[in-house]
Regions:
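N-terminal flexible segment immediately upstream of the FAD-binding catalytic core
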Residues: 1-67, 83-113, 264-274, 320-347, ...
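FAD-binding subdomain of flavoenzyme oxidoreductases
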Residues: 104-258, 476-484
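Alpha-helix capping/hinge segments and adjacent helical runs
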Residues: 24-25, 415-427, 451-452, 456-462
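C-terminal substrate-recognition/cap domain of FAD-linked oxidoreductases
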Residues: 30-39, 218-222, 228, 232-406, ...
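A glycine- and small-aliphatic-rich helix-loop capping segment at beta-alpha/alpha-beta transitions
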Residues: 86-103, 131-135, 158-169, 216-222, ...
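Activity-critical C-terminal alpha-helical subdomain
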Residues: 183, 433-484
Length: 484
């Protein structure tokens, strides 16, 4: 690959040498062939070419990197595991700062139920480390086997259990962060009490635009004494939606309530992630109840009755932990299973009122038919967080154009139903053009001003969250970072 290095510009090589002094030569990638895997995240339809990638192994190295980039006014993108679904952790011409080697769990306090972790700690690894204490980390995105706590903080990630337990912000007590200019700040506190303005709340969900987390203090949750997992199948989406509304209206708060449509069911069952879902069903609900053992039987019976009244064909209760894990594997791996259906996949993330589920899902089916595309739906029914999955071939310009049109129509439909454009995947590049659907120019300008408090030069993850025509960032960024 020696010839490949000749394509690296001299300024880039000089910067790579400075970075190598911090992390060692094996911690810097600069050849185009080495950077291929960092051109996109979990949404491969967006691809951007970084000029370099650097991988700090320790907190001091990360601090030195950010300060060097500040000194040279170089734009950068913090990146965790690259599992995001909004084109968030990529940009042309930037230095990509990979955080996956900062993966130490610094402390676990089982009495206070707190953990302090570095940003590269994998989500599920934290739960495994807390298990001996009877604790777990509640936010559980479908990518929890790979995604990092730092990435979860950037996106304010949720997961199937967020209705009852909350999203990432509800579990983050404090963040130590380095701002793009190299200043180190502490946001929040271990006690979880707000002092002054809620800057921690601003940082969580800022998509890497405000700086980089050095460590995160999170709240751990006690494992519930009893868990019951049910699978109900229906012959119509409307019946499953009615069951969802009935359960929530009853006062029972499920730990999770997930819906999958027939197309998704069949994709999962045809894959290595087959979970035993009925392939002739038009919809299934995966319902999980947890809490005190004393009331579990009664709540389970009530949920069963509501599903039957709504038209459930069969209801199955997991007999043991192995069966429960298998049912959840099908749901958690659904996006991966759809990779067999088509070479490319785009996933949307709109949120609508639960009561509008039947009509919005019917509209999505009509949009799919009209544009000649396949849309699979798998989502958090309990809070109306839809995840329409559209399979397509990016090498077919006509199909790609139809998919883009369909996505715009889906987003407009969800907003018209009283919803919003994202629940947990973030804005990234994917939803920039949809921001004016829900925010006025004045609101977008206010967001720009907030960003400039943390990052006046707008070098940290440039071109994200706020449409560029609403912000000075596009005009201030170096041409290399703008792809021109």
């Amino acid at each position: 690959m020696a010839n490949d290095s000749t394509t690296v510009p001299t300024p880039t090589r000089e910067l790579a040498e400075r970075l190598a002094e911090i992390v060692g030569p094996r911690g810097v990638l600069q050849r185009p062939s080495e950077l291929v895997v960092y051109r996109s995240d979990g949404l491969p339809g967006y691809a951007k070419q970084p000029q370099l990638a650097v991988f700090p192994r320790a907190r001091d190295e990360l601090i030195a990197i950010v300060r060097l980039l500040a000194e040279r006014r170089v734009p950068f993108v913090p990146r965790g595991a690259g599992t995001g679904l909004s084109g968030g952790a990529l940009a042309d011409g930037v230095v990509l700062v990979g955080l996956n080697r900062l993966n130490r769990i610094l402390s676990i306090d089982p009495v206070e139920r707190l953990a302090v972790v570095e940003p590269g700690v994998v989500n599920v690894a934290l739960t495994r480390a807390a298990t001996p204490y009877g604790l777990h980390y509640a936010p559980d995105p479908s990518s929890q086997a790979a995604c990092t706590i730092g990435g979860n903080v950037a996106e304010n990630a949720g997961g199937p259990h967020c209705l009852k337990y909350g999203v990432t912000l509800n579990h983050v007590r404090a963040v130590t962060a380095i701002l793009p200019d190299g200043e180190i700040i502490r946001l929040g506190n271990a006690a979880g009490e707000a002092d002054g303005y809620d800057l921690l709340g601003a940082f969580v969900g800022s998509e890497g635009c405000f700086g980089v987390a050095l460590d995160v203090t999170v709240r751990l949750s006690p494992n519930p004494p009893a868990v019951r997992t049910l699978l109900a199948d229906f012959m119509s989406i409307g019946a499953a939606a009615r069951a969802t509304s009935a359960i929530i209206a009853s006062g029972i708060v499920p730990a999770a309530l997930e819906m999958m449509d027939g197309a998704t069911i069949r994709a999962v069952e045809a894959s290595i992630y087959a979970a035993g879902y009925p392939v002739d069903a038009e919809a299934i609900l995966l319902i999980e109840l947890d809490g005190l053992a004393a009331g579990m039987d009664a709540d389970t019976a009530r949920v069963e009755a509501m599903c039957q009244e709504a038209g459930a064909r069969t209801i199955r209760i997991a007999r043991d932990e192995a069966e429960r894990a298998r049912l959840w594997q099908g749901r958690k791996k659904a996006f991966g299973a759809m990779g067999r259906v088509s070479p490319h996949l785009v996933v949307q993330d709109a949120v609508i009122p639960r009561t509008r589920l039947p009509e919005v899902l019917a509209s999505i089916r009509e949009i799919a038919t009209r544009h000649g595309i396949t849309i699979c739906n798998v989502f958090h029914a309990d809070d109306g967080n839809l995840h329409p999955n559209i399979g397509y071939d990016a090498n077919d310009p006509d199909e790609q154009a139809r998919v883009q049109t369909a996505m715009r129509e889906i987003m407009a439909t969800c907003v018209a139903a009283g919803g919003t454009i994202t629940g947990e995947h973030g804005i990234g590049l994917d939803k920039l053009d949809y921001m004016p659907l829900i925010f006025s120019d004045e609101s977008l300008a206010a967001m720009c001003r907030l960003r400039e408090v943390f990052d006046p030069d707008r070098r940290s993850n440039p071109g994200k969250v706020i449409p560029i025509h609403s912000c000075r960032e596009w005009h201030a960024a170096p041409k290399a970072a703008r792809g021109v």
